[in-house]
Curated annotation (Swiss-Prot):
Component of the PEX2-PEX10-PEX12 retrotranslocation channel, composed of PEX2, PEX10 and PEX12. Its EC number is 2.3.2.27. The lineage of its organism: Eukaryota, Fungi, Dikarya, Ascomycota, Saccharomycotina. Its main location: membrane. The chain crosses the membrane at residues 25-54, 56-77, 106-138, 146-166, 203-222. PANTHER family: PEROXISOME ASSEMBLY PROTEIN 10, PEROXISOME BIOGENESIS FACTOR 10. GO terms for cellular component: peroxisomal importomer complex; peroxisomal membrane; transmembrane transporter complex; ubiquitin ligase complex. It is an enzyme of class 2 (transferase). This is Peroxisome biogenesis factor 10. It comes from Saccharomyces cerevisiae (strain ATCC 204508 / S288c).
């Protein structure tokens, strides 16, 4: 009886020591690229469906939201159901906890499926809203804090990607936060293990290159920040003394006044045939919103669209919607009589 218990304990110890190997960086990137390809097809289908149900204007107004919705659907029907995405099946990967001792829990995978596409979107929206409020209220301190937070996020992302190239553990920050790590769902043969080890070494070379790039990028920022912090009090006291003398005088000369509000602007709508009569009837509709142009604007290639339609389009994709020629928002010209 004692011998049987001893054998059972030894068997359990061996079973607990049996772990699937962690996935390497090239395999994780390969799975991610495959998922991006599938998500791109899904985004295209969702966009076409919204065109049929709503309109082209709706699709042009919410391209980012439609993309997020398609990615959320993809993750909910795969990861959210504790299954695997097509990219993970393609490379034969699955999620485990941070140490690789057990599979990731269902609740964690559901929360991750929501957080992965939605968190970056809401963070970006919040940052843009803060910056917009700062410009309207002219609060310099809050603007500097927002700029600092953006720089801090960029620094964290750079460090995160550098660690990934060296260790190959977490490809996204969301997975690092949730502690969801990839493992192969099969035992690697000797040849496959050697092949993947060679691929990991090549990614480490990229890690060293990225590390050198980040050092050159962030070293001047770090030194200037430390210098400002060391001499900040003295400079602040001097600036307060000097600015208190001529603050009112400078504000009177440097402030910009008389900027009209949006409601005070004169808009041109081509539904009125007296507006820009040289434009023929067949060319007076915007192909983006399928309505008569409002404030007709010209891209560098010469094609005409509504100001708001073309500006929204170029912010997402800097190109002409018709001929795909390069078009930056600052290159758009508004037509006037």
């Amino acid at each position: 009886m004692k011998n049987d218990n001893k054998l059972q304990k030894e068997a359990l110890m061996r079973l607990s020591q049996l772990r699937f190997p962690f996935a390497d960086a090239p395999s994780i990137v390969q799975a991610h690229q495959k998922d991006e390809q599938i998500q791109g097809l899904l985004i295209m289908k969702v966009t076409e469906l919204c065109k049929l149900i709503k309109s082209q204007l709706f699709v042009n107004s919410y391209p980012k939201e439609l993309s997020i919705f398609a990615k959320l659907l993809y993750l909910l029907f795969t990861t959210g159901r504790r299954g695997r995405t097509l990219g993970e099946e393609y490379v034969d990967l699955t999620y485990t906890n941070r140490k690789g001792t057990r599979l990731a829990g269902r609740l964690k995978m559901i929360v991750f499926a929501f957080a992965y596409p939605l968190c970056p979107y809401f963070i970006t929206k919040l940052y843009k809203k803060i910056m917009k409020n700062n410009k309207e209220s002219k609060i310099e301190d809050t603007e500097s804090v927002a700029a600092f937070c953006k720089g801090l996020l960029d620094f964290i992302l750079d460090v995160h990607m550098t660690l990934f190239y060296f260790k190959g553990a977490f490809y996204s920050i969301s997975k690092r936060i949730f502690g969801m790590r990839y493992v192969f769902k099969h035992i690697l043969s000797k040849n496959e293990a050697n092949f993947r080890e060679e691929g990991s070494q090549k990614y480490k070379v990229l890690g060293y290159i990225l590390l050198a790039q980040n050092v050159m990028k962030w070293y001047p920022v770090l030194t200037s920040t430390l210098g400002s912090w060391i001499y900040g009090r003295k400079r602040t006291n001097d600036s307060i003394t000097r600015s208190s003398v001529g603050l009112q005088e400078r504000s009177e000369h440097e402030s910009i006044e008389g900027i009209p509000k949006e409601s005070q602007l004169t808009h041109i709508n081509l539904s009125d045939k007296n507006q820009l009569p040289f434009i023929p009837e067949a060319s007076r509709k915007c192909i983006l919103c399928l309505m008569n142009m409002s404030d007709p604007s010209c891209a560098p290639c010469g094609h005409l669209f509504c100001w708001s339609c073309l500006m929204s389009w170029c912010k997402e994709r800097p190109e002409c919607p018709l001929c795909r020629q390069h078009c930056q928002p600052q290159e758009i010209l508004v037509l006037r009589q």
